[in-house]
């Protein structure tokens, strides 16, 4: 769990996302509160529940991007899911408890990665010895092994092909369901896992070059040094105390006014979400998981429905409301120039791989922003995503001919931009064909 202060979290988000100060503050405080809770004594820690967040704002203003960046910062089990993927319990499809099961798998992956780093040195040596066995045989003299070890570490043998024995996974094995426990839940049992445990794991030979063999063997040797049961227990503890779930597109499961009758992927899903967000115990194949202290961040554009169309109980379980503002022309210019991996920097770097030096002038950036604003206002406002469309249109010819123009310098100015997009942006009928 990261111990960044709210100010540090906001400044980290500022590097990638323009504006939306309120949303950044809300998620920063929520993330810091996870750390604060861990500092309390056991009795009080149980009582402190997370304040779940509902982010409301039009499409393309940064809701999903905030979640993506937060996942990297959190250092905790983090899962982003779309609410539209789920159906009510009892119907064909995924039920919402699958969210917790997926979160546990994420947690296990995180903990395993951390444990592998702890045993990296021992595993590295064991993997190196197995590669040497494949190269010179287990019975080779120490002098021969040392000579080959030096060459191996120098990278001289990277392209040499060797045959190694690796653990055979159960990917090709059939799955079967326990009656009454559908496959979307924990009832899908992998026969490969069961047989592997019963017979101590199977291995199969693989022919790969030395460079590819080392990572495969490193992971295998690291796993031998790790207590797998301890990983699962630690992961469940991490998920229960630090887990974060980002529920995107929650507006799509809101009931709409004037609709009648059951809707298994709308109100039914909301009803199923209630106990999950409030706090319940979910059965997983690794054991029961409590959701009382998992932080839920829900987001939606609410174009057609309103937040008040959600079930009142669900609204009550999302106490912190944050509204994100629509982006302006000035925001578009900042997105193109100030963010760490801006679209302009990406385009210049991509053209650089072809040997083309691309220069996009300041007035070109402003012209791209103008075109995006104009098309958004004439057709459909899809926020910052429109910038990708405009840039692709501007650089379309160059992207196609770049391999033939290696060594050239191409300057894109405002006139160049307008000549490519102005007609389409001005004509509302035609601009409907800009996706």
Curated annotation (Swiss-Prot):
<dbReference type="InterPro" id="IPR027417">
    <property type="entry name" value="P-loop_NTPase"/>
</dbReference>
<keyword id="KW-0067">ATP-binding</keyword>
<dbReference type="Pfam" id="PF00004">
    <property type="entry name" value="AAA"/>
</dbReference>
<dbReference type="InterPro" id="IPR003593">
    <property type="entry name" value="AAA+_ATPase"/>
</dbReference>
<comment type="subunit">
    <text>A double ring-shaped homohexamer of HslV is capped on each side by a ring-shaped HslU homohexamer. The assembly of the HslU/HslV complex is dependent on binding of ATP.</text>
</comment>
<dbReference type="GO" id="GO:0036402">
    <property type="term" value="F:proteasome-activating activity"/>
</dbReference>
<dbReference type="GO" id="GO:0043335">
    <property type="term" value="P:protein unfolding"/>
</dbReference>
<feature type="binding site">
    <location>
        <position position="313"/>
    </location>
    <ligand>
        <name>ATP</name>
    </ligand>
</feature>
<feature type="binding site">
    <location>
        <begin position="60"/>
        <end position="65"/>
    </location>
    <ligand>
        <name>ATP</name>
    </ligand>
</feature>
<feature type="binding site">
    <location>
        <position position="385"/>
    </location>
    <ligand>
        <name>ATP</name>
    </ligand>
</feature>
<feature type="binding site">
    <location>
        <position position="18"/>
    </location>
    <ligand>
        <name>ATP</name>
    </ligand>
</feature>
<dbReference type="GO" id="GO:0051603">
    <property type="term" value="P:proteolysis involved in protein catabolic process"/>
</dbReference>
<feature type="binding site">
    <location>
        <position position="248"/>
    </location>
    <ligand>
        <name>ATP</name>
    </ligand>
</feature>
<dbReference type="GO" id="GO:0005524">
    <property type="term" value="F:ATP binding"/>
</dbReference>
<keyword id="KW-0963">Cytoplasm</keyword>
<protein>
    <recommendedName>
        <fullName>ATP-dependent protease ATPase subunit HslU</fullName>
    </recommendedName>
</protein>
<keyword id="KW-0143">Chaperone</keyword>
<dbReference type="Pfam" id="PF07724">
    <property type="entry name" value="AAA_2"/>
</dbReference>
<keyword id="KW-0547">Nucleotide-binding</keyword>
<dbReference type="GO" id="GO:0008233">
    <property type="term" value="F:peptidase activity"/>
</dbReference>
<dbReference type="InterPro" id="IPR004491">
    <property type="entry name" value="HslU"/>
</dbReference>
<keyword id="KW-0346">Stress response</keyword>
<dbReference type="InterPro" id="IPR019489">
    <property type="entry name" value="Clp_ATPase_C"/>
</dbReference>
<dbReference type="GO" id="GO:0016887">
    <property type="term" value="F:ATP hydrolysis activity"/>
</dbReference>
<dbReference type="InterPro" id="IPR003959">
    <property type="entry name" value="ATPase_AAA_core"/>
</dbReference>
<dbReference type="InterPro" id="IPR050052">
    <property type="entry name" value="ATP-dep_Clp_protease_ClpX"/>
</dbReference>
<dbReference type="GO" id="GO:0009376">
    <property type="term" value="C:HslUV protease complex"/>
</dbReference>
<comment type="function">
    <text>ATPase subunit of a proteasome-like degradation complex; this subunit has chaperone activity. The binding of ATP and its subsequent hydrolysis by HslU are essential for unfolding of protein substrates subsequently hydrolyzed by HslV. HslU recognizes the N-terminal part of its protein substrates and unfolds these before they are guided to HslV for hydrolysis.</text>
</comment>
<comment type="similarity">
    <text>Belongs to the ClpX chaperone family. HslU subfamily.</text>
</comment>
């Amino acid at each position: 769990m990261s111990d960044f202060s709210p100010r540090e979290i906001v400044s980290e988000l500022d590097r990638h996302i323009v504006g939306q100060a309120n949303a950044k503050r809300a998620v920063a405080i929520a993330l810091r509160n996870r750390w604060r809770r861990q500092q309390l004594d056991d009795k009080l820690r149980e009582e402190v529940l997370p304040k779940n967040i509902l982010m409301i704002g039009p499409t393309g203003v940064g809701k999903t991007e905030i979640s993506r960046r937060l996942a990297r910062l959190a250092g905790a089990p983090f899962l982003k899911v779309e609410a539209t993927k789920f159906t009510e319990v009892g119907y064909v499809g995924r039920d919402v408890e699958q969210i917790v099961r997926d979160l546990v798998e994420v947690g296990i992956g995180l903990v395993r990665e951390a444990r592998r780093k702890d045993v990296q040195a021992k595993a590295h040596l064991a993997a190196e010895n197995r590669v040497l066995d494949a190269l010179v045989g287990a019975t080779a003299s120490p002098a021969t092994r040392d000579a080959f070890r030096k060459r191996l570490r120098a990278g001289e043998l990277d392209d040499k092909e060797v045959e190694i024995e690796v653990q055979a996974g159960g990917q090709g094995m059939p799955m079967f369901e326990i009656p009454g426990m559908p496959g979307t839940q924990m009832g899908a049992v992998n026969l490969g896992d069961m047989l592997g445990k019963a017979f101590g794991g199977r291995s199969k030979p693989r022919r790969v070059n030395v460079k590819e063999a080392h990572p495969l063997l490193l992971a295998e040797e690291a796993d031998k040094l790790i207590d797998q049961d301890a990983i699962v227990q630690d992961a469940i503890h991490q998920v229960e105390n630090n887990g974060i779930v980002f529920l995107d597109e929650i507006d799509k499961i809101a009931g709409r006014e004037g609709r009648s009758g059951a809707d298994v992927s709308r109100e039914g899903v909301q009803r199923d979400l209630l106990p999950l967000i409030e706090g319940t115990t979910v059965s997983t194949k690794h054991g029961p998981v409590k959701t009382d202290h998992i932080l839920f961040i829900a987001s939606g554009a609410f174009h057609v429905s309103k937040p008040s169309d959600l079930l009142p109980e669900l609204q009550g379980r999302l106490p912190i409301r944050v509204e994100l503002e629509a982006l302006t022309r000035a925001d578009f210019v900042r997105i193109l120039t100030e963010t760490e991996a801006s679209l302009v920097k990406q385009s210049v770097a991509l053209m650089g791989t072809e040997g083309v030096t691309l220069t996009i002038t300041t007035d070109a950036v402003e012209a791209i922003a103008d075109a995006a604003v104009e098309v958004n206002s004439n057709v459909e406002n899809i926020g910052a995503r429109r910038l990708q469309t405009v840039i692709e249109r501007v650089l379309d010819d160059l992207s196609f001919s770049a391999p033939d123009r290696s060594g050239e310098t191409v300057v894109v100015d405002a006139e160049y931009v307008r000549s490519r997009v102005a007609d389409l942006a001005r004509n509302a009928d035609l601009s409907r064909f800009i996706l």
